[in-house]
Amino acid sequence: MTKVRKAIIPAAGLGTRFLPATKALAKEMLPIVDKPTIQFIVEEALKSGIEEILVVTGKAKRSIEDHFDSNFELEYNLQAKGKNELLKLVDETTAINLHFIRQSHPRGLGDAVLQAKAFVGNEPFVVMLGDDLMDITNASAKPLTKQLMEDYDKTHASTIAVMKVPHEDVSSYGVIAPQGKAVKGLYSVDTFVEKPQPEDAPSDLAIIGRYLLTPEIFGILERQTPGAGNEVQLTDAIDTLNKTQRVFAREFKGNRYDVGDKFGFMKTSIDYALEHPQVKEDLKNYIIKLGKALEKSKVPTHSK
């Protein structure tokens, strides 16, 4: 059996929801306190046992490559000043086996994954979406990517991460139609549906940003016609794959943080900061003070 060694991180999106910040800075480089969002993804991959990572980028994404490259001047300066803890943090971002390829035009997630065909070869691989951060406030939790890899060791089949979402939100996700009940959190899947209307959704089990796929997906993606949004949808290709190979779905029970929009990004930043040793106490005190001020502002005043 071929071991899962490789991961793909699609990072070619334009990041329009975060303009003007993303005009010159990659969305994936926006920090949660002091760490870019893409670094959380890379750390999850490494913690799971992934050996090689391909980042699929687009225009104005050079900052991602720079972040994971060495910076001699910075490293020399930190070493000379004896700032060893900071030097260690910098070193952790450079000792990684990362590769980069550019998606020339944003034609959808399926097309971004297809750019990795030569990198992956004939091996199973993981796709990790940068908008979904998993259990970042729980260092002891088993990474979701690791859970998918363990499932593959048992089934030798593609496995997609899913999570229950409010029924009214299903139109924002790909959704699975499960076959029967889950066995230890693992579902057999009948069909995959991309962004159904709530009244048409086969379940509340939404696909979240982790996929373990067999290499046969590439042949399907090469023939895939554009779907929702006139883009090549990975969900559609997985549904086609499911007709010739079994595809499973792993239900994620941990905490998922969606950093794909402003409010989700702010919530994630607050939750992570409340666990950050350098800022958590000050932030807690500030939130308590702010909460009292907001409650006071709600009290109606009565004029005589």
UniProtKB/Swiss-Prot annotation:
Please give the pathway this protein is involved in: Carbohydrate metabolism; nucleotide-sugar metabolism
Give the EC class as a word: transferase
| Keyword terms, alphabetized | Nucleotidyltransferase, Transferase
Classification via InterPro entries: GalU_uridylyltTrfase_bac/arc, NTP_transferase_dom, Nucleotide-diphossugar_trans
EC numbers for this chain:
2.7.7.9
Catalytic activity field: alpha-D-glucose 1-phosphate + UTP + H(+) = UDP-alpha-D-glucose + diphosphate
GO terms, biological process? biosynthetic process; UDP-alpha-D-glucose metabolic process
**Gene Ontology terms for molecular function:** UTP:glucose-1-phosphate uridylyltransferase activity
Matching entries from Pfam families are given as: NTP_transferase
Which residue ranges does UniProt annotate as crossing the membrane?
A: none
What family does the entry list? Belongs to the UDPGP type 2 family.
This protein's name: UTP--glucose-1-phosphate uridylyltransferase 1
Source organism: Streptococcus pyogenes serotype M1
